[in-house]
C-alpha cells in the first residue's frame, strides 16, 4: 500500500520533514517513490513553514494512496489558510518585545480613557446635586 507521510531530516533538536509518497513497508526515512513537499516546524522569520505540491498529492490520493494523520492535518491547514500555514514563527526575543510593546500601548490607552472619565466625574456631582435640589423644592 502506498502512503503519503513525513520523512524526518534535519539535525538533532532541529527537525525538518520531507512529505513523501512511499511504500508502507519501507522505513520512515528510507526509500520513497516521490517527494511532494516539506514541513519545517522550526521556521523563523522569512522561512517558509509548509510547502506542498497540491496536484501531485491529489494525483496520488486518486491512485489510492493513504495519508498519515499529520499529513492530513497539514493539508487541511494549508487549504484553510495558506498564508498562515506558510508563514514562519517569531523568535523568542521578538515575541517578548512585541508583547511588551502591546502592553505599553494598552496601558497608555487605559490611562488616556481614565482621564476624561475623571473629568466627567468631577463635573457630574454638581449636576446631580442640582437635580437633587430640584426634587426637594
From Swiss-Prot:
| Positions with biased composition (Low complexity) | 126-137
Is Ligase set as a keyword in this record?
A: no
Superkingdom to which the source organism belongs: Bacteria
List compositional bias (Basic and acidic residues) regions by residue number: 80-99, 111-125
UniProt-listed InterPro entries? Ribosomal_bS16, Ribosomal_bS16_dom_sf
Q: Does the keyword Ribonucleoprotein apply?
A: yes
Name assigned to this protein: Small ribosomal subunit protein bS16
What organism is listed for this UniProt entry?
A: Coxiella burnetii (strain RSA 493 / Nine Mile phase I)
Q: Gene symbol?
A: rpsP
